Each structure stands twice: as C-alpha cells, then as structure tokens.
Amino acid sequence: MTDLYAVVGNPIAHSKSPLIHRLFAEQTDQDLVYEALLIDTEDTTFQFAISDLIARGYRGINITVPFKLDAFELADELSPRAEVAHAVNTFSFKDGKIFGDNTDGIGLVTDIEENANRPFKDQKVLILGAGGAVQGILQPLLEKQPGLVHIANRTAKRAEVLGKRFETFSPITSSDWEGIPDQAYDIIINGTSASLEGKLPPINSNVVGQDSLVYDMMYGAEPTIFMQWAQQHQPSCQVRDGLGMLVGQAAEAFYIWRGVRPQTQSVIDEVRRLIQA
C-alpha cells in the first residue's frame, strides 16, 4: 500500500517539497505519495487539519510557515532538537501519538559541511538575524564546535536573548548590526528574509574575507542579492543559497519516516535545474 505524506502551510503552492520527496522516493525505491496542502485558518484550525490528516491515514507531515510554533505546541512528544528550537517542522504519526522534530538545522549543517565542504569546527561564524529560522539551526550548528559564533540582529536584545538560550552548547556573542566586531568571518549565514524583498542587512563588507563562505538561507532562480553583494566585495569568496538546506532538511525528514537516508546533491542539482528553466 502506498504511504501518504504532505507538507502543510499557507501559502504552499510554491513549495518544492513534493518534487524533492518524489526524487528521494525514486532514488531509494520507496512507495509513497507526498503532497502540498494548504491550511486556511479562516476555514479550519491547525489542530483540526492535522487530526483530519491522521484520520485519513497520513504517516507524516512537514510543517512550514506559519505553523511551526503551532506544531511545537500540538506535538505529544518532541525530539531534543525540536525542544531546544521551540519549533517543529516534521510530524510522525504512530500509535495515536504525534511526534515532533525539527530538521532545519541538520539540513543547513549537512549542506555546508558535506556539499560545500566547509566543516564548522574551530571556524569563526557570523549569523545574521535572530528569528525562528535562526532558532532552528543553532543547536546542530553549535554541536559542530565552531571556534566563535556571533549573532547580529536589528535589535540587539533579541540576539542577546537567543545567545543566552544556547550558551550551554557554546559561548555566543551578540549585537545589533552596528556592533558586529570588525573582522572577517570564515562562515557568514544570512538567516533574515531580506533577500526575498531584494534588501540587504545593513552590515559592513569587512566581515567577508577572501576565503569566506557566505550562505543565504533564502534561494531563487538567480543568486540572491546577499550573495551578489558578498562577491562584489570579495570576488574570491564562496557563496551558496538555501536550496541545499531545503533539500537537506527534507532528507532528514525522509530518513525519520522511512529509515533510509537519500543522497542530496543530485536532488539539489535537479531542483536547481527546474527552478532556472
């Protein structure tokens, strides 16, 4: 019997997750169907929508904007990484219980360490933004033992609060945009959504070194404005968008559900080709 899975969110029509999971299923010879489903909160609640999917026999669900906090609150049991992130992007349904997990961080770490070939260990890391996206990546990143992590945000207080929450994993410094220490970083991660609006975080270009990896968690058909900005200032730096993170978090969810870990680079290449077509 074919197993049912889906991604839920609002909006959802743009989601690449059904394509990604179809490619994973083909690669690993798994019998499943994966759909993108809109949850319209004018017609229903998140809790009712999930109950309906369970009743219809779905085995697991991915959760995207704006329901990751609702998912965190609805889960009967949480993985340690979801508990720390205070957000859930993956549900598994088993024995009448909802298990919540967060695969965003492992998606980013895998993409940077394996696909970009840049281990975090002992590296100087600058993270831009202190919202939900950054919250979800911090624990897996810090477990890789970077040498230094600085979180910068429009409001320094939010960055400071986030840093304190995760300081048991690794020492973290924080500031507003103006307070970023004036030095080059090995890895720079843009966890803001500024690129979606064609905007840049107001930071000094000195943070980009000749050998920096500059990573934007957003992605599109063209290099993001943040990637373009980095290469204008340091043509030799390495730039990468968040498509690999998207595929990486999907691969981790696929592994949770199916017990099989798919290879990601070929899927990244295929999705990129279709986005650019």
From Swiss-Prot:
NADP(+) binds at residues 129-133, 153-158, 217, 242. Coiled coil: none annotated. SUPFAM superfamilies: Aminoacid dehydrogenase-like, N-terminal domain, NAD(P)-binding Rossmann-fold domains. GO terms for molecular function: NADP binding; shikimate 3-dehydrogenase (NADP+) activity. Shikimate binds at residues 15-17, 64, 89, 104, 219. Keywords: Amino-acid biosynthesis, Aromatic amino acid biosynthesis, NADP, Oxidoreductase. The active site is at 68 (proton acceptor). The keyword Endoplasmic reticulum does not apply. Its EC number is 1.1.1.25. It comes from the Bacteria. Pathway: Metabolic intermediate biosynthesis; chorismate biosynthesis; chorismate from D-erythrose 4-phosphate and phosphoenolpyruvate: step 4/7. Pfam families: SDH_C, Shikimate_DH, Shikimate_dh_N. GO terms for biological process: amino acid biosynthetic process; aromatic amino acid family biosynthetic process; chorismate biosynthetic process; shikimate metabolic process. GO terms for cellular component: cytosol. It catalyses: shikimate + NADP(+) = 3-dehydroshikimate + NADPH + H(+). Belongs to the shikimate dehydrogenase family. Involved in the biosynthesis of the chorismate, which leads to the biosynthesis of aromatic amino acids. Catalyzes the reversible NADPH linked reduction of 3-dehydroshikimate (DHSA) to yield shikimate (SA). NCBIfam families: aroE, PRK00258.1-2. HAMAP family: Shikimate_DH_AroE. This is Shikimate dehydrogenase (NADP(+)). It comes from Hydrogenovibrio crunogenus (strain DSM 25203 / XCL-2). The gene is aroE.
